[in-house]
Swiss-Prot record:
Protein name: Insertion element IS116 uncharacterized 44.8 kDa protein
Paired cysteines (S-S): none
Keywords on record: Transposable element
Domain of life: Bacteria
GO molecular function: DNA binding; transposase activity
Protein family membership: Belongs to the transposase IS1111A/IS1328/IS1533 family.
Record carries keyword Ligase: no
Matches recorded under PANTHER family: PUTATIVE TRANSPOSASE FOR IS117-RELATED, TRANSPOSASE FOR INSERTION SEQUENCE ELEMENT IS1111A
One Pfam family hit: Transposase_20
One of the protein's GO biological processes: DNA transposition
Length: 399
């Protein structure tokens, strides 16, 4: 049986190219401090060195892609690993001697925190489905960010060619105007083409409401006769950006299709999608973040992770002062907020609850957040009981 001194804690300051590992014993004495290249052979050597003691507990400050190899090897060798948030490391570093910041010091802080605290979340190797959904949803977020950048650049260039044409359409929501910009970018070109020919040209490219798009474009073109400086070069850039935007939309569609197909291989997909406002994309985001829900004891813990459970800020006689937490998963909060907003727009219990909160004097955003918190409880109960969503609670239906 191991004694108190047979147990060690290894803190790892993880990085992309290399990690730094520091081991401490139960008395807080440093046993070793070493640099470890992010390579299988060196990580295995570190594991074997640490396992010379009877019991080893590991702690890392990064749970993302940089530590994937490290975590996979630790889990494969049956090691216990916990996650020490970077915010904790940053705050606790100030309690140590000296103002310097090094990888070795951070690793020592991580090891000490793991030694003194028992409430850090354990890390395990996620299922292949969860890993795949994380990759796909992260890639989708990158594609959406690229799309926003392209649209902003496109609108900026159009303003320098014809401000009226830039104002005429919502290029982020309609495909037709973007298709038009692949061929016609200037007021003069649009006026020469005319409404009839432009409608025919758009119709051949299967643009929805081609006549409306053509009429609005020609109307905007007729408001400007002057040629602005740099128009010749700007038109080429607009044409190029329009082609890029159309190609990017196809990539997003392909990615969404893959997300949908992958998500629906999960046994919980049907349950999650049965809840109003939770489509395949938001459902995939949910599974990618929470995994199998084993890290949450109850719905309150899940709501806390999503930043939907207020935390107290009491002092002395000042009590009942609640505010939004600072540490929570932004994407998880976003998906519950968006699903609540979608569900609120349709008749049903979500809209009834939203209107009830509005009647109590809450602002729109406050009522939506309150609804999102309520829906966390509902989704948790659905997954726990493995049942689909029903407008009325099960007890009411039975009665």
């Amino acid at each position: 049986m191991s004694t108190r001194h047979d147990r060690i804690w290894v803190g790892i300051d993880a990085g992309k190219g290399h990690h730094w590992a520091v081991a401490v014993d139960a008395d807080g004495e440093t046993l070793f401090s070493t640099k470890v290249i992010n390579d299988e052979a060196q990580v295995l050597t570190l594991i074997e060195t640490a396992r010379e003691r009877e019991e080893v507990r590991w702690a890392v400050d990064i749970s993302g892609r940089a530590s994937t190899l490290l975590l996979a090897l630790l889990v494969a060798h049956g090691q216990n690993v916990v996650y020490v948030p970077g915010r904790t490391v940053n705050r606790m570093s100030g309690a140590y001697k000296g103002e310097g910041k090094t990888d070795a010091k951070d690793a020592r802080v991580i090891a000490d925190q793991a030694r003194m605290r028992r409430d850090f979340a354990p890390l395990d190797r996620p299922p292949e489905l969860v890993t795949t959904l994380r990759l796909l949803t992260n890639h989708r977020a990158d594609l959406i960010a690229d799309r926003v950048r392209l649209i902003n650049r496109l609108r900026d260039l159009l303003t320098g060619i014809c401000p009226a044409l830039e104002r005429a359409f919502d290029y982020s929501a309609a495909k037709g105007p973007v298709v038009m910009l692949t061929e016609y970018q200037t007021p003069a070109a649009l006026r020469r083409t005319g409404v009839k020919r432009l409608t025919t040209w758009l119709g051949r490219r299967k643009v929805r409401d081609a006549d409306t798009v053509a009429a609005k474009a020609i109307e905007a073109a007729r408001t400007q006769q002057v040629v602005l400086p740099g128009e010749k070069r700007a038109t080429k850039l607009v044409c190029d950006l329009a082609h890029q935007l159309l190609a990017l939309d196809e990539r997003i569609k392909d990615n969404d299709r893959e997300i949908r197909e992958t998500f629906r291989t999960d046994d919980r997909a049907e349950i999650i999608e049965s809840m109003p406002g939770m489509g395949p994309v938001l459902g995939a985001e949910f599974v990618a973040i929470v995994g199998d829900l084993s890290g949450y004891k109850d719905a309150g813990r899940l709501a806390s992770h999503a930043g939907l459970a207020p935390v107290p800020r009491d002092s002395g006689r000042r009590t009942g002062n609640y505010h939004r937490p600072q540490r929570y998963n932004r994407r998880l909060r976003w998906l519950f907020y968006m699903s609540a907003q979608t569900a609120m727009m349709r008749p049903g219990p979500s809209r009834d609850y939203y209107l009830k909160k509005r009647g109590e004097g809450l602002l729109h955003t406050q009522a939506l957040l309150s609804l999102a918190r309520r829906r966390v409880d509902v989704l948790w109960a659905m997954l726990r009981d493995k049942r689909l969503f029903t407008p009325a609670p099960p007890v009411t239906q039975t009665a």
